[in-house]
Amino acid sequence: MILCEESYPEILDQICSYLTPGEVELLFINKDEMRELNRSERGIDKTTDVLSFPLELVIHAPLGSIVINKDMVKEKAAELNHSEDAETALLFTHGLLHILGYDHEKDDGQMREKECEVIAKFNLPKSLIVRSEDVRLIDLINKKG
């Protein structure tokens, strides 16, 4: 179940139920608020698309919070030619997987695999991990060329 004061795409409820029976808090903020949150929580002074904050296991508490940058949702959806709902679903999935303990920077592809599973099940566009890999590959090709 999702705890959110704003409206959000219905598909997020389906994704959440598919991945966990637990509750998750969802927040939408703008790029400036996200930059400040990223700076204060991670020491990185730039905006980002999604942050997730797992909570310690507390009875009757949400599993954690997912914070989505609504400005970047609009930008990425337009840039990648898909809907804002689809972009929001990708970011939500990515954040929820982090809350559930997945870590694409440390695992052996388990998070990428789970993200791909959700993408296929809910017919979503390319995942954040795959998009990041595409950018790194293009950068590598450009450096060699």
Curated annotation (Swiss-Prot):
Binding positions (Zn(2+)): 94, 98, 104
Alphabetical list of SUPFAM superfamilies matching this protein: Metalloproteases ('zincins'), catalytic domain (SSF55486)
Cell compartments where the protein resides: Cytoplasm
InterPro entries the UniProt entry points to: MetalPrtase_cat_dom_sf_prd, YbeY, YbeY_CS
Record flagged with keyword Nuclease: yes
UniProt keyword annotation of Coiled coil present: no
Needed co-factor(s): Zn(2+)
Gene3D superfamilies cross-referenced by the UniProt entry: Metalloproteases ('zincins'), catalytic domain (3.40.390.30)
Full protein name: Endoribonuclease YbeY
Species this chain originates from: Campylobacter concisus (strain 13826)
Lineage of the organism: Bacteria, Pseudomonadati, Campylobacterota, Epsilonproteobacteria, Campylobacterales
